[in-house]
Amino acid sequence: MKKHILYALLLVFVTSFSATAQKNRINGIKFSRHHFVDTVKIKIWDGAVIIPVEINGQTRHLMFDTGAEFGFWIGDEEGWMKASGDTISVTDSQNSRLKKAFLTFPPIKVGDVVIENYPMVVDKGMSDYVCDRIDGAFGYDLVARGLSFKFDTKDSVMIVTDRKNYFSKEEKGQPTLKYLRCHKTRPMVWVRFPFGLFKLVFDSGAIGGEIDLSEDFVSRIAHADPEIRQKLDAITVRKDTTVITEAGLFGNSQDSVSYRTLHCPEVGLDNLILKDVWISTDKRLSKIGSTILEHNSLIVNGNKMHLVLLPHDGKMVQHVGNENKKGLKLLLADKNDTLGVLKAVVRKDGEAYRNGLRSGDYLESINGVLITDYCTYLDLMTEAMEQHCVFRTPEGTRKEVEW
């Protein structure tokens, strides 16, 4: 079952405020050292980078999220956080919009470097989905402030520096994704598809995501150019309607959407070629997700305004082969649903359908462990290799499936 019925964590902000306010807020951040290079041991969660830090005398874990313009904290506001006086209108990944206050955090120690006056938005909307794996995230504002990072996702090490050319030797000849900062200051990079060259958000906070295209985006470009429409139709293997669920900072949503499945013989990221890529257009945002970092380390160079991928095996051609042949996704049930925690969405051409599963069936247990909450499921999906799953229909019929 593993990643093919993966939870969809979209830790993404889309924000709107004046450039002057953004500049003043970034310039208020201070670092305890200058002209430094520091190495920090990190954790990798499904391609996402998790950084241990010390805040208020405790070890916390912050994800590095290139898809977020600024930092955010998942949980309740606590006494050691201080109001900064600045507010912002924030729209999260599922289009929920709220006006939030920036809170200034006490000094944050990352390795031997202390970050002072770092502001974050605080909300507990994601608490049910991260299951204590992370406490929050650093946003892309640290790069805008002049820091560069190397995330060695093979050996789980991060190098952070304020030296402008520190990574120059490592970057030579490697896949380089140059970007322009839009007004949201998130990295937008060029990606080559069989139907053209398009710019996507590089979002390291989209946990478990490879390459996502929204149906709105695909339909728009197909409508505008008959040649692109013809190329898209040539690689479209399925059109259907499905249920999607997305978790944002301010809650979660479910919706039925039209989508298509694209089978791309190859996708290009500069001179890195991804072969046999399957893309579903049932997401709201078009982006590259964290799964790219399961096979490639990453240099984030804010001074040169580019991202550099470092393939773990040194090869510039990588086989992805991410087709979901099982045709099964699991979505969180409503909190007041007394029949179960996770419900199946089953596609008719997949293995799950042939094994008797149907949309609306509830996942009861995995390897004999009852699924009573989302975090239990998440732990089992992380640990288990072969799984014996028991589902039940809303009427109570029991179904057993081996994955």
Residue ranges and their predicted role:
Residues M1-I26:
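Bacterial Sec-dependent N-terminal signal peptides
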